[in-house]
Amino acid sequence: MKKICPNKINTINEKEILVVDVRENFEFKEYRIDVENIENIPLSEIDNKIQEFPDNREVILVCNNGLRSEMALKFLEQRGFRNLKFIEGGIVKWIQNHLKIIGNAPDIVSHSLSLDKTCGK
């Protein structure tokens, strides 16, 4: 699986990389990770918006906890996309690694799933 831990990301603001938040629009408007090249394409709309995914640059998918972004990755790979990764643990692990977000995540996000900020366990 092509996953990347938030504490290993150091090049996410490069112009060649596109971050796609696959949460619903209302979630994205409330809070999101603080990176330059980010778009919101909800998992529920990916099939209708598949043409918005570039096939010539790396795409990193993110959601709240990694579940939807992993599903999106599998869906896109089945349709021929190859330059894909997803953020393991999603925004939860992003926050646990003290990385910046825009907006205010609810307290439950920062306390859900895991108290461990590392990945791969």
Predicted regions and their residues:
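Rhodanese-like catalytic fold shared by cysteine-dependent sulfurtransferases
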Residues: M1-L18, N25-E58, L67-K121
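Short, surface-exposed ligand- or partner-binding patches at beta-edge/loop junctions that are enriched
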Residues: V62-C63
